[in-house]
Amino acid sequence: MTKQEKAENQEKPTEETVEETPKKETPFEPVMEADEVEETTEAQAPVEEADDKLAELQKKYDAMEDSFLRSQAEIKNIQMRNQKEQANLLKYDGQSLAKDVLPVLDNLERALAAEATDESLKKGVQMTYDHMKHALEDHGVKEIEAQGQAFDPTIHQAVQTVAVDGDQKADTVVQVFQKGYYLKDRVLRPAMVVVAQ
């Protein structure tokens, strides 16, 4: 080839096509130098310590909050129990006084049952009895109905048993020796009774 042919070849574009492969874009990864890596590790250490302390403090906080809530609930329960006990004390406040007065009421009943020659004396005893019974009823003391009722060991005290007679039913109160009384819903004194067997 002559020089002229070489020049022509250079000027003519060749028909060969070269396919270019597209380059993939890689994400930018900063290259850290050794000093920068050490600084990052040193900076992360206090952050990790702070995270650990925070987690520990959170656990302590949760435990204290739980303890606080339990204590509050216990205090509320104690207060409610206290109120209930006070209500019961007020409800049954006169129990010992009523127990002491019941024998006096029994004696007044016996005096009224006895034959009296002086009508004015009997009338005075009756008035005293009525007044005392009314005062006791005002404070929640009421008589236990026993005569003719089925025997109930929670409110009756059997002092004697007798054979069933005529139209009587077994386990029925046939006679009352001493009246029994309630104080509100509590048995103050059981009735002393005779029971048919």
From Swiss-Prot:
Pfam families, per the entry: GrpE
Quaternary structure and interacting proteins, as annotated: Homodimer.
BP term (GO), one: protein folding
Protein role: Participates actively in the response to hyperosmotic and heat shock by preventing the aggregation of stress-denatured proteins, in association with DnaK and GrpE. It is the nucleotide exchange factor for DnaK and may function as a thermosensor. Unfolded proteins bind initially to DnaJ; upon interaction with the DnaJ-bound protein, DnaK hydrolyzes its bound ATP, resulting in the formation of a stable complex. GrpE releases ADP from DnaK; ATP binding to DnaK triggers the release of the substrate protein, thus completing the reaction cycle.
Family indicated by similarity: Belongs to the GrpE family.
Sequence segments annotated as region (Disordered): 1-50
Alphabetical UniProt keywords: Chaperone, Cytoplasm, Stress response
A Gene Ontology molecular function term of the record: protein-folding chaperone binding
Domain of life assignment: Bacteria
Biased composition (Basic and acidic residues): 1-27
A GO CC term attached to the entry: cytoplasm
Official protein name in the record: Protein GrpE
Statement: the UniProt record of this protein carries the keyword Cytoplasm: yes
Record-linked Gene3D superfamilies: 3.90.20.20, Head domain of nucleotide exchange factor GrpE (2.30.22.10)
PANTHER family, per database record: GRPE PROTEIN, GRPE PROTEIN HOMOLOG, MITOCHONDRIAL
Family matches, as InterPro entries: GrpE, GrpE_coiled_coil, GrpE_head
Chain intervals with Acidic residues compositional bias: 32-41
NCBIfam families: PRK14140.1 (NF010738), PRK14162.1 (NF010759)
UniProt subcellular location: Cytoplasm
Major location (coarse): cytoplasm
